[in-house]
Design a protein with these regions (language model features):
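RNA/tRNA-interacting regions in translation and RNA-turnover enzymes
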Residues: 1-125
Length: 125
């Protein structure tokens, strides 16, 4: 995930999909909202874009949350490539991600979905 982020310039969230409760919504961090960044402790996410599940925040552009972090026992990954500045290069970064996952962790049953303001649909990478 970090390699793809460095190479593409996109902020990328990586989560253990089995730890996410319900669906995800993108919102804005609130003053005083409790958020524990992986290896960083409690963070102030006020004003930052934040993905939330049915429990609390799970990801911001600067850090993912301890509760939904990827571990050695993770078997289902949710990876979000945030194209805040537009779609240019997003498909290439997604394809590179899938390539790495298949090559180095023997990923199977990989599904990708492009979600934009204008439309939403499954894509093949």
């Amino acid at each position: 995930i970090n390699l793809v982020s460095i190479r593409s310039g996109y902020s990328i969230g990586g989560f253990d999909a089995d730890k996410i409760v319900g669906g995800l919504e993108l919102g804005v961090g609130k003053e005083g909202e409790i958020y524990h960044g992986i290896g960083r402790g409690e963070l102030n996410i006020a004003g930052l874009p934040v993905y939330r599940d049915g429990v609390a925040g799970v990801g911001t552009p600067t850090s993912d949350e301890e509760r939904t972090k990827i571990e050695m026992s993770t078997t289902s990954l949710l990876m979000i490539l945030n194209g805040y500045s537009g779609k240019e290069g997003l498909l290439e970064a997604g394809g590179y991600s899938v390539d790495l996952l298949k090559r180095y962790v023997s990923a199977v049953n990989v599904e990708a979905e492009l979600i934009c303001r204008e439309n939403r649909g499954k894509i093949t990478l």
